[in-house]
Amino acid sequence: MLLELQPYWDFNAFTQRPAHLARALSKIAHLDEAQLWALDNDVEQQAHYFADAFPTLFEWQAQCEPTQVNTQLPSIPFWLHTDIPGRKWQQIQGFCAAATQKAHASGTAPAIEWCAGKGHLGRLHTWLCAQPVISIEWQNSLCLQGQQYANKLKLPQQFINADIHQLPLSATTAQSTATQAPHWMALHACGELHCHFLHTATQHKASTIALAPCCYHRQQATHYQALCTAAQATALPATLNLQALRLAQQNQITAGNREREQRANELNWRLGYEALRQTLQPGTPYKNLPSKQKQSHDNFEQFCQWAALKHQITLPATIDWPAFEAQGQQERLQMMRHDAIRHCFRRPLELWLALDKAVFLEEQGYSVTLQQFCASHVSPRNLLLLANRDINAANSPLSKP
């Protein structure tokens, strides 16, 4: 299905305006900016406008969308999360509520926390389960801060500074600990790191695995490297370049109004500048611009002068700046309409990527569930893979990618 509908999601709305989208675009041509924002995060509205164009897409998503976990945690003392931002703390609680049920059976053997950062997840886990935690993190400064937290709270949490990009783990202490650890967990490990996590955990025959994947595009390869044999046998991975992998997580549900306004203004300027550049260099392909930290005194004219300098373009003395800025605003609305079509495929792509990992775990002898550990407004990256090593796992297949 994703392959059949590839022309509707595999394009860059900033630089491309595919003609075959005309029928789908006509469905939302009357929507203003506020309505387009609302459409962007509402599957029911997306189905209302585009179900005729993509009926199988919304049917498949409805069938595959996992349910949300509703497990309640016991009352948690305030001192355990005083330095954790609210939304991050909600994510950690949701993850632990789902994952610690399996970990309780692991006894006093240590758990592994992968891509630990400061070990916020590990601290809650060890408090809930009375189970030691080994928190593995490659940034030494985060390890030091996390260890200070754990020592202050007298929790059995040990940090190991190790290069988790490599397989096997380079640190001898981490390697020996991993062999003994029955429970492995990773909350929002990025791209290659969560793939390394799955390979390493299964190689060490972890009893239970809990993974919330994130940032699928953060990898060295130019295209997605499928994990399970079923996905490897399809043509889809070869089409999933970094742009497609970014699409799977391209969501601004958690962005504040100010952040959205700043992003919209930046796009207005970039598109307005591109319109200006095309009048000076007609027919030339789009030229990338580096990211720019905007200052309070910036305006459209100053932005264009900066961009022209980067492109080594001499601007004419007289330019109708308001006209080009207005053109940029209109182009951004067109971009939003094109993205409204692409964004219908965000969740299906993400589900496919998660199912690839789930089936890989089944192939390694695990029984697997896929569920949501928090609401999408807390984090749009709310998929959680829970795997339990089971000799009968092969008899409980998930829907294959």
Predicted regions and their residues:
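A short N-terminal interaction module
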Residues: 1-72, 295-303
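Conserved SAM-binding motif I beta-strand of class I
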Residues: 132-137
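Conserved SAM-binding loop of SAM-dependent methyltransferases across substrates and taxa
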Residues: 118-130
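Conserved class I S-adenosyl-L-methionine
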Residues: 107-115
